[in-house]
Amino acid sequence: MNHLYNIIIKLVDKIFLPILSIFNKKIKRFIKSRRIQSQKNYGDLHKKNKNIWFHAASLGEYELATAIIKTIQKDKSTRIILTFFSESGFKLKNRIKEIDYTYYLPLDTENKSRNFIEFINPKKVFFIKSEIWPNYIKELGRKKIDTYLIDGKFEKEDWYFKIPFMNFAKKILKTYKKILVQNKESKDVLIKNNIKNVTVSG
């Protein structure tokens, strides 16, 4: 399944998105914004910092993590890096005062995930709610970087627990150092599927 996922994500990156961008302005901006970001020369911007990386799909999901971010910021040596996948979230970055650096999340190919993690050099990583990106999580696990999923919500009908995705998804979920879920029902679903690195955070 991991091999199949990588084939699909490469096809999306190299073929499907470029074709669709001809007809869809939003997809065209998606490609252009990430290309511009990748071409900038940031040098060793993040090499010496104690970087904590948060990833959210949108501004709404980011707001779920503000309490954790404010706690982390008590350590003045840390730098908070925030990534968005959506254009709408990124456009509102100037409203977010707690963040030191904001980027678009590159697509989850093996090379792009590896290069981006190398670039931002995180010491800890927090994915918010339902943001599960296999190659990013696999690379973070390989580099032994503590990675957390916060404010997660799981139901027994979720794709994670369906054949043929089950083993693939379980391996990803078990890579997290800790999964913080919204309610006991979510915890019970994970425990039932032998995913024990879970705590109810409310």
Where are the language model's segments positioned?
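Membrane-interacting alpha-helical segments
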Residues: 1, 5-12, 16-23
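Active-site and donor-binding regions of nucleotide-sugar-utilizing enzymes
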Residues: 17, 21-202
